[in-house]
């Protein structure tokens, strides 16, 4: 394998300005997200507290991810199909 000489990277003024703009944008998004969490936390729909019961926590997770569990039937025909003994 041929080895190349290292290429020199130069930092330009445009690169620095772009970095600063992106960093400011990320900081404003983070502050907005924190503000929403603070407002949502007072309604009870924000972060899950430690004192909440497991059913409500489970229900909040189900609502958040959109999972709708279907109960499984407990009869033998559903477990073994149409096999006869």
Swiss-Prot record:
<dbReference type="GO" id="GO:0070936">
    <property type="term" value="P:protein K48-linked ubiquitination"/>
</dbReference>
<feature type="modified residue" description="Phosphoserine">
    <location>
        <position position="82"/>
    </location>
</feature>
<feature type="modified residue" description="Phosphoserine">
    <location>
        <position position="42"/>
    </location>
</feature>
<dbReference type="InterPro" id="IPR018860">
    <property type="entry name" value="APC_suCDC26"/>
</dbReference>
<keyword id="KW-0175">Coiled coil</keyword>
<dbReference type="GO" id="GO:0005680">
    <property type="term" value="C:anaphase-promoting complex"/>
</dbReference>
<protein>
    <recommendedName>
        <fullName>Anaphase-promoting complex subunit CDC26</fullName>
    </recommendedName>
</protein>
<keyword id="KW-0597">Phosphoprotein</keyword>
<feature type="region of interest" description="Disordered">
    <location>
        <begin position="30"/>
        <end position="85"/>
    </location>
</feature>
<comment type="pathway">
    <text>Protein modification; protein ubiquitination.</text>
</comment>
<keyword id="KW-0132">Cell division</keyword>
<comment type="function">
    <text>Component of the anaphase promoting complex/cyclosome (APC/C), a cell cycle-regulated E3 ubiquitin ligase that controls progression through mitosis and the G1 phase of the cell cycle. The APC/C complex acts by mediating ubiquitination and subsequent degradation of target proteins: it mainly mediates the formation of 'Lys-11'-linked polyubiquitin chains and, to a lower extent, the formation of 'Lys-48'- and 'Lys-63'-linked polyubiquitin chains. The APC/C complex catalyzes assembly of branched 'Lys-11'-/'Lys-48'-linked branched ubiquitin chains on target proteins.</text>
</comment>
<dbReference type="Pfam" id="PF10471">
    <property type="entry name" value="ANAPC_CDC26"/>
</dbReference>
<keyword id="KW-0498">Mitosis</keyword>
<feature type="compositionally biased region" description="Polar residues">
    <location>
        <begin position="73"/>
        <end position="85"/>
    </location>
</feature>
<dbReference type="GO" id="GO:0141198">
    <property type="term" value="P:protein branched polyubiquitination"/>
</dbReference>
<keyword id="KW-0539">Nucleus</keyword>
<keyword id="KW-0131">Cell cycle</keyword>
<comment type="subunit">
    <text>V-shaped homodimer. Interacts with CDC16. The mammalian APC/C is composed at least of 14 distinct subunits ANAPC1, ANAPC2, CDC27/APC3, ANAPC4, ANAPC5, CDC16/APC6, ANAPC7, CDC23/APC8, ANAPC10, ANAPC11, CDC26/APC12, ANAPC13, ANAPC15 and ANAPC16 that assemble into a complex of at least 19 chains with a combined molecular mass of around 1.2 MDa; APC/C interacts with FZR1 and FBXO5.</text>
</comment>
<dbReference type="GO" id="GO:0007346">
    <property type="term" value="P:regulation of mitotic cell cycle"/>
</dbReference>
<keyword id="KW-0833">Ubl conjugation pathway</keyword>
<comment type="similarity">
    <text>Belongs to the CDC26 family.</text>
</comment>
<dbReference type="GO" id="GO:0031145">
    <property type="term" value="P:anaphase-promoting complex-dependent catabolic process"/>
</dbReference>
<feature type="coiled-coil region">
    <location>
        <begin position="7"/>
        <end position="38"/>
    </location>
</feature>
<dbReference type="GO" id="GO:0070979">
    <property type="term" value="P:protein K11-linked ubiquitination"/>
</dbReference>
<dbReference type="GO" id="GO:0051301">
    <property type="term" value="P:cell division"/>
</dbReference>
């Amino acid at each position: 394998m041929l080895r190349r000489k290292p290429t020199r990277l130069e930092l330009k003024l445009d690169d620095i300005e772009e970095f600063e703009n992106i960093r400011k944008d990320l900081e404003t998004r983070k502050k907005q997200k924190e503000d929403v969490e603070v407002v949502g936390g007072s309604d009870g729909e924000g972060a899950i507290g430690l004192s909440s019961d497991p059913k409500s926590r489970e229900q909040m997770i189900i609502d958040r991810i959109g999972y709708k569990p279907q109960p499984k039937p407990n009869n033998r025909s559903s477990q073994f199909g149409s096999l006869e003994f």
